[in-house]
């Protein structure tokens, strides 16, 4: 089958004169805005001023993008050392979620301290929003035909009862691939539903955020095993190492904070 015979989606959404606007950026931006809406709405319900999350996003998103790119470049340094002009080129992908998460957490801690609010309260409120943004953001990878898995057949993809536009987009340079972006996106959407339900359980403060870290990490660990473009450190897939680490750290934090009496307040308490 010729590549030209398989209709595919253009990664460029619109052309503004000489400047292409990529779907990747539009999708990432959509995830940020929907996440902000969700966090702002819940924040107001819990007594957080509306502009708090707006201000946080305006600071955290650029820093998260910077950290996500730095993280990616560090583990792909062999390529970028030879192509330094490409280090700042993020129009077609190259943002590592774990790097972005590190940047967002650092920013959140400093922001909360400056505003005189509990970081854990902000983190709990933001947890479903972050996961929603990640679920939506994976569709940017879909448009870029990246973050896919190993080779499969068209029959395999049809057996998953996927719509043609997904199957066709997974046809890259003459080969069909696992739509790992979809697996992770669906896992994340399920996680959003779980976190929204757990809000009503009134967990101890901070534990909704740790639940997010555990949920995301478990899914990412298994999906990462299918991918062909993993960032590597020797024989290890960095994302899998990070995922295991986040699960362990989250469980330790939950136990230690409870034993030390640092998790006495509940999610719904002001």
UniProtKB/Swiss-Prot annotation:
PROSITE patterns cross-referenced by the UniProt entry: LGT
The protein's name in its UniProt record: Phosphatidylglycerol--prolipoprotein diacylglyceryl transferase
EC number: 2.5.1.145
Family recorded in the similarity comment: Belongs to the Lgt family.
One BP annotation, GO: lipoprotein biosynthetic process
Localization in the cell: Cell membrane
Organism of derivation: Bacillus cereus (strain B4264)
Binding site for a 1,2-diacyl-sn-glycero-3-phospho-(1'-sn-glycerol): 138
Keywords, alphabetical: Cell membrane, Membrane, Transferase, Transmembrane, Transmembrane helix
GO molecular function, one term: phosphatidylglycerol-prolipoprotein diacylglyceryl transferase activity
Main location: membrane
GO cellular component, one term: plasma membrane
HAMAP family: Lgt
Function statement: Catalyzes the transfer of the diacylglyceryl group from phosphatidylglycerol to the sulfhydryl group of the N-terminal cysteine of a prolipoprotein, the first step in the formation of mature lipoproteins.
InterPro entries referenced in this protein's UniProt entry, alphabetically: Lgt
TM region positions: 19-39, 56-76, 92-112, 116-136, 178-198, 206-226, 236-256
Taxonomic placement: Bacteria, Bacillati, Bacillota, Bacilli, Bacillales
Known pathway: Protein modification; lipoprotein biosynthesis (diacylglyceryl transfer)
Membrane topology category: Multi-pass membrane protein
């Amino acid at each position: 089958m010729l590549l030209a015979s398989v209709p595919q989606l253009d990664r460029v959404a619109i052309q503004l004169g000489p400047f292409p606007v990529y779907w990747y950026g539009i999708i990432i931006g959509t995830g940020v805005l929907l996440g902000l809406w969700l966090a702002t709405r819940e924040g107001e319900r819990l007594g957080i001023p509306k502009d708090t999350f707006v201000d946080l996003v305006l600071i955290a998103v650029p820093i998260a993008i910077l950290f996500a790119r730095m993280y990616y470049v560090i583990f792909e340094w062999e390529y970028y050392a030879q192509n330094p002009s490409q280090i700042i080129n993020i129009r077609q992908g190259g943002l590592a979620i774990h790097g972005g998460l590190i940047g967002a957490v650092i920013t959140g801690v400093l922001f909360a301290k400056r505003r005189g609010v509990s970081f854990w309260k902000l983190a709990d409120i933001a947890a479903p929003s972050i996961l929603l943004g990640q679920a939506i953001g994976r569709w940017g990878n879909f448009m870029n035909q990246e973050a896919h898995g190993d080779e499969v057949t068209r029959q395999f993809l049809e057996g998953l009862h996927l719509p043609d536009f997904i199957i066709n987009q997974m046809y890259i340079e003459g080969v069909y691939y696992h739509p790992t972006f979809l697996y992770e996106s669906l896992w994340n959407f399920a996680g959003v539903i779980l976190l929204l339900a757990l809000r009503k359980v009134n967990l101890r403060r901070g534990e909704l955020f740790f639940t997010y870290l555990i949920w995301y990490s478990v899914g990412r660990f298994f999906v990462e095993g299918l991918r062909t473009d993993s960032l590597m450190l020797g024989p290890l897939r960095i994302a899998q190492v990070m995922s295991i680490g986040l699960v362990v750290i989250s469980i330790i934090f939950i136990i230690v904070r409870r034993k030390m009496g640092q998790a006495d307040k509940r999610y719904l308490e002001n």
